[in-house]
């Protein structure tokens, strides 16, 4: 089971505080869940690097930018490692390299952080292959 950082969203209104602070997974493709489990397995096998993570972004369209790919049916998620270091971010990105079309560090606004610098990096944005 892939851990999720927050409760499911109760509504989808962009500027309504009742619809904030949530993470949806309904509508994620099965392949995306399978890829996340593969990443979990990779992290479990690491002896020197604790790269376990939680899912922090899924299909909650209303919490992302207007042109977001975070939508039901899309293989797009955000993850936050339990240990937030540059080495862990890069390790997860490298581990997912064969099954993603996009794997990058982003800040809390969804802006790309090229070097995965800490503390600027807030999460990893993954767009998995179909």
Regions flagged by a language model, labelled:
Residues 53-68:
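Active-site nucleotide-donor binding segment shared across nucleotidyl transfer reactions
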Residues 42-56, 100-112:
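Short glycine-rich, low-complexity/disordered patches
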Residues 1-54:
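Active-site acidic/histidine clusters and adjacent loop/turn architecture
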Residues 26, 64-130:
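Catalytic cores and adjacent binding grooves of peptidoglycan-active enzymes
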């Amino acid at each position: 089971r892939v851990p999720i950082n927050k409760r499911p969203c109760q509504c989808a209104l962009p500027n309504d505080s009742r619809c904030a602070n949530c993470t949806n997974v309904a509508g994620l493709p099965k392949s995306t869940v399978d890829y996340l489990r593969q990443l979990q397995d990779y992290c479990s096998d690491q002896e020197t690097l604790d790269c376990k993570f939680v899912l922090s972004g899924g299909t909650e369209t209303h919490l992302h930018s207007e042109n977001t790919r975070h939508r039901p049916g899309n293989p797009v998620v955000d993850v936050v490692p339990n240990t937030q270091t540059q080495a862990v971010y890069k390790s997860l990105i490298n581990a997912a390299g064969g099954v993603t079309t996009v794997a990058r560090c982003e800040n809390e606004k969804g802006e790309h952080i090229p070097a995965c610098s800490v503390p600027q990096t807030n999460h990893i944005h993954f767009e998995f292959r179909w």
